[in-house]
């Protein structure tokens, strides 16, 4: 495990995790639901007790989850990380590397289904030097926007994953003091005006400056690590996502409505991890989901901001203990 203490984080990442990434992680591409190329990363554990498929959040990319992936691997899991379309090295429907754009969240859902069908499941049966994975439990770990996508996927395909961990899931968006009617009216206005691949008002291109205080991280060292990866010349701007198109924003509102409409399909065990100081997603919506679906457990982290995995100390220690205790119930079943 990467040390939880902030002062030990960077040395450990430099001397242990970065070399491990070079030796154990490989990447590739596969055709998404529409044939567009989607990027992924994988780390195959030689003695796995389960498989974890990871979905990142809005404007996320692989480098932001190096620590999470390493810790999951060290705990005995094989990891498959999907870089969602319009993020990282995956297909971009618009020219700006800073803009996240999608027509409908079902595109994400079907990309995940394609990922499972073409990479994850075949990978387990075609690799002769690894044990037979077909009997291993399959888990889903998803953060924020990934949590919304995961929930939609689990509603549409309820029999694939044994259990899911939703970390600060975007069950609804936190709009602060802005009333929902005004949000919906603005979304309708952008549609009537034909604003599709234009930024949502108030958002724009990545400016190359750090904004730690406004970020979802509470550990400066962890924030700085992923921010440096955003700036890395070798990434050629692939990690500079910074805002959404109006089309993506409308799609997100539709996805949230659909999520609630189909919630009765959520029957598999769910672990909802809630950040007490979250200003990005709506905690009350997470509470409601916990109350309205079967087999849902919610654990709150009072001092955490949106990215609980970018906390430190006791909060981060609790985060991983809760996740592994939950997954181990089904990995050992």
What do the PLM-derived regions correspond to, one by one?
Residues 62, 69-95:
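Conserved alpha/beta-hydrolase
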Residues 57-60:
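Active-site glycine-rich loops that stabilize anionic/oxyanionic intermediates
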Residues 268, 282-291:
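Short alpha-helix in the alpha/beta-hydrolase fold that links the catalytic acid
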Residues 1-31, 37-44:
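An N-terminal hydrophobic leader/cap segment in hydrolases
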Residues 297, 302-333:
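Catalytic active-site module of serine/aspartate enzymes centered on a nucleophile-bearing elbow/loop
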Residues 266, 272-274, 278:
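Short beta-strand/loop motif that positions the catalytic acidic residue
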Residues 145, 149-240:
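Alpha/beta-hydrolase-fold enzymes
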Residues 100-126:
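Alpha/beta-hydrolase active-site loop
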């Amino acid at each position: 495990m990467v040390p939880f203490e902030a002062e030990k984080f960077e040395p450990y990442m430099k001397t242990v995790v970065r070399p491990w990434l070079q030796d154990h992680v490989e990447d590739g591409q596969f055709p998404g639901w529409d044939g567009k190329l989607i990027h992924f990363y994988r780390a195959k554990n030689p003695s796995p007790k389960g498989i974890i498929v990871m979905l990142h959040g809005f404007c996320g990319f692989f480098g932001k989850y190096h620590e999470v992936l390493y810790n999951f691997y060290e705990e005995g899991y094989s990891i498959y990380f999907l870089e969602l379309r319009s993020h990282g090295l995956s297909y971009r429907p618009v020219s700006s590397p800073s803009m996240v754009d999608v027509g409908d969240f079902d595109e994400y859902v079907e990309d995940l289904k394609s990922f499972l069908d073409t990479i994850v499941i075949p990978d387990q049966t075609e690799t002769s030097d690894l044990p037979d994975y077909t009997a291993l439990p399959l888990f889903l770990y998803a953060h924020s926007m990934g949590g919304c996508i995961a929930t939609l996927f689990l509603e549409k395909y309820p029999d694939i994953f044994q259990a899911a961990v939703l970390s600060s899931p975007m069950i609804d968006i936190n709009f602060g003091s802005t009333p929902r009617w005004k949000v919906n009216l603005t979304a309708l206005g952008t549609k009537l005006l034909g604003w599709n691949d234009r930024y949502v008002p108030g958002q724009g291109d990545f400016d190359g400056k750090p904004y730690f205080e406004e970020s979802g991280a509470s550990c400066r060292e962890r924030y700085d690590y992923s921010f440096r990866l955003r700036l890395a010349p070798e990434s050629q701007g692939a990690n500079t996502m910074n805002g959404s198109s109006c089309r993506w924003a409308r799609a997100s509102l539709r996805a949230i409505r659909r999520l609630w409409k189909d919630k009765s399909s959520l029957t598999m065990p769910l672990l909802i991890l809630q950040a007490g100081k979250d200003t990005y997603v709506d905690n009350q919506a997470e509470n409601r989901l916990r109350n309205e679906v079967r087999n849902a457990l919610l654990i709150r982290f009072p001092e955490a901001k949106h990215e609980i995995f970018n906390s430190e100390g006791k909060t981060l220690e609790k985060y991983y203990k809760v996740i592994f205790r939950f997954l181990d119930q089904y990995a050992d079943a």
